């Protein structure tokens, strides 16, 4: 990408600008795919471990360029999931997608619900949401406006320990991702007060 920056500064002919933009976009896509490949090959390398959900979300927040978006982490300390150590990437991807595609998003909220013996970690935002026709497709490799790899990677990371994810939001009212953690893959530990 360094040579493209130099070329842009020295570019004498504005007529060539369209070609420059296409080459620059292609280079960015290639760089993103290389990064994805690097991350994908790490899935399952390390054994799953118990991880505090609230702490993992806090770590992901620090890695995410939030701009003016507020993240509300309502997950309580002491609720743990048994997952691949890359689970932090799951929460990063959800926030990154909300910021990229949510429109005029102001808030992302993480919470937990119970459904029978399962725990559901909810990530919801106040953006534009996901249209009904794309609720399943967004998890497919290559689908999307950027690299199409983030939510595919999310599914792969979660599936290591039988955790699933689905989008259940209402289009026009925000996205809502439900991470379904089956019985045996979550636990509550004693909290310090």
Specify the residue positions occupied by each region the protein language model found:
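Short conserved segment of the HATPase_c
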Residues: 130-141
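Conserved C-terminal segment of the DHp
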Residues: 1-14
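Conserved catalytic submotifs in the C-terminal HATPase_c
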Residues: 70-81
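Acidic ATP/Mg2+-coordinating residue in the GHKL
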Residues: 125
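Short helix-loop "hinge" at the ATP-lid/N-box region of the Bergerat-fold HATPase_c
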Residues: 98-99
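Conserved DHp (HisKA) dimerization/phosphotransfer helix of two-component histidine kinases, i.e.
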Residues: 17-68
């Amino acid at each position: 990408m360094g040579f493209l920056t130099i070329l842009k500064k020295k570019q004498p002919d504005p007529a060539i600008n369209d070609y420059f933009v296409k080459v620059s976009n292609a280079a960015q896509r290639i760089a993103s795919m290389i990064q994805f490949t690097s991350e994908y090959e790490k899935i399952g390398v390390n054994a799953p471990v118990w991880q505090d959900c609230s702490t993992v979300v806090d770590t992901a927040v620090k890695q995410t360029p939030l701009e003016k978006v507020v993240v509300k982490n309502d997950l309580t300390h002491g609720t743990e999931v048994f997952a691949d150590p890359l689970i932090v990437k799951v929460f990063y991807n959800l926030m990154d997608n909300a910021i990229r595609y949510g429109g005029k998003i102001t808030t992302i909220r993480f919470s937990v619900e119970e459904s029978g013996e399962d725990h559901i970690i909810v990530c919801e935002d106040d953006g534009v949401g996901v249209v009904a026709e794309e609720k399943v497709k967004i998890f497919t490799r290559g689908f999307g406006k950027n690299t199409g790899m983030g939510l595919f990677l999310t599914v792969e990371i979660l599936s290591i320990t039988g955790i699933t994810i689905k989008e259940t939001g209402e289009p026009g009212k925000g996205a809502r991702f439900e991470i379904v953690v089956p019985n045996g893959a979550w636990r509550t530990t004693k909290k310090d007060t």
